[in-house]
Each structure stands twice: as structure tokens, then as C-alpha cells.
């Protein structure tokens, strides 16, 4: 039996499909999306970013239980989403200050959990870069930061989705073989830390614990893990988390993310869905940049739709309801916030 306050429960239900699985689309990218559109189009314009997000939301949210957006460029997309699609809202500033050690997080100054809720948000999402092996003086700042967010979300009774992105302060190339060998331990450490009740996290938005580019049978070159080792890392991460968790696509291709989810399904990992971003819509940027709105709309109605609906089928086969970590749906006791 677990007690969940009504606001958090209602938010989680609005973000989930009829099976309790979070089949969500992510397009809260800001700086990176702006650069991608600028490269494809040759010009920089805030409206281009807004329009791209709006078209993605309009065309793809009929196939998603929820969408993750920002309020900087995403307001038109929020209004354009399908009526049955829930809304997660980003609270953190994009990127980090590269002149300061530790990739420290920061919040959007004119936003709060209350304002996110007032704007129709069903959950607050925070991304934090995390290296469990960095000095305590850096990580304690991040811990206190997340404790404050958790308290704020509890106060206004809205779900808190935390996205810890792991890194190594010394191995700076996150796509390297060297980092691939470190990644499983980093992801496990982030799960152990941020599952603690002090943070008030409701759902963990996790990286998969391996880089599939280096998994035997998937790798084209060097190998960091056998398939059995990769499976063990998936299973250990699943067992470590007392909280519901979903996977993020982390900028990989649609094909690679589908293979990743198939792998999780084959090994009975207890994940409760995905927040899939670039894997779904990134190939549409070039179409938008070179051919405009109508061409992007057509791409979204064909390839974009195929990307998301084929992923939905995989979730249908393997994802478990968000309440599975607590037992059955009947084991979730909904209480009014005091």
C-alpha cells in the first residue's frame, strides 16, 4: 500500500494511457533545437522554433499519452496538443554555465511549480546533470536544489519528474568507449540517490544504463558489454528503483531507440513508458528547414506517425503501469493533501 495525494495521482493518470503507461513525446529542447533548425534553414528565428513545436504537437499528440514542452518556445504547441494528451512542463533553464565546474542547474526565473500547474501542466520536469563521483561541494548543491523542487511540488500537489543525465567530469566524451564502460555504475548511482524520499520524486526519467553503440551484436566496432552484461545492467537498474521510471531517447535515432526498447522488453524490465524526443521528430527538421510547414506536416503524418505508433506497439508489449512498483492499482491509496 502506498499513499499518493490526489493532485499527484490525477496528474500521473492524465499523463498515462488507458493501461497506466506513460507513452509521452518530448519536445522541450530549446538551445539545441534552435541550432538544428538554424542549420537546416540558414536563418535564426524564434517563430521557426515555435512553429516546429506546434506542428509536431498538433500532428503527433493524438498518438501520445502526453507531451513534454517548455514555456519559452512551446506555448503555441501546448495549445495545439490533442485534448486527451497530458502536459509535462520543463522548469529548468536550458543547458548549463560551462564557465563554472559541475554543470550546475538553474531554474527559469519567472516560473514556479504553482505557475506550471496554473498553466495547465500535469507535472513538473527537471533535468539535472549528475556525476556521482564529483566532489561533495558540487553534488551537495544539486541535492539541495532538488530537495527544494521536491518540496515545491509537494506544496502545490503536482507530480515531480526528475531526469538525471549522468556524466564523468574527467571523461568528457560521453559517446566514447571509455565512458560507455563507466555509464552503468553512474546510472545505478543516480537511481539510488534520487529515489530517496527526501527529494519527493514521483517518476524517474532515466537514461538506459548502456550505450548500445558498444553492445555486442549492436556494435559496429569496439564492444564494451556482451548482451548478457547489458541485460544485467537493465535488470539491476529496474530492481534498484522503488519508483516508477520511464526511458528517455537521449538523442539516438528512431531505429536505435526502438531496438533499445525491444531489448528492455525481452528482459522483462519494469519500465513504465518513455519520453521520446529526437528519435521521433529529428528527421523532420531538415524537411522543415528546406521545404517549410506543409512538407513538415506531410512528413509528420507519414514518417513521424510511423515512428511514434511503432514505439507505442513496443510499449504495449513490454511497459508496465506506473503503479506496478507499488503493487496493484488497488494498492495505491489516494488521499487529499493536508
From Swiss-Prot:
Q: Which UniProt keywords apply?
A: Lactose metabolism, Lyase
Pathway entry:
Carbohydrate metabolism; D-tagatose 6-phosphate degradation; D-glyceraldehyde 3-phosphate and glycerone phosphate from D-tagatose 6-phosphate: step 2/2
- Out of the domains of life, which is the source? Bacteria
* GO biological process, alphabetically ordered: 6-sulfoquinovose(1-) catabolic process; D-tagatose 6-phosphate catabolic process; lactose catabolic process via tagatose-6-phosphate
Enzyme Commission code(s) on record: 4.1.2.40
Catalytic activity, as annotated: D-tagatofuranose 1,6-bisphosphate = D-glyceraldehyde 3-phosphate + dihydroxyacetone phosphate
Q: What class of enzyme is it?
A: lyase
Question: A Gene Ontology molecular-function term?
Answer: tagatose-bisphosphate aldolase activity
Entry similarity comment: Belongs to the aldolase LacD family.
Name of the protein this chain belongs to: Tagatose 1,6-diphosphate aldolase
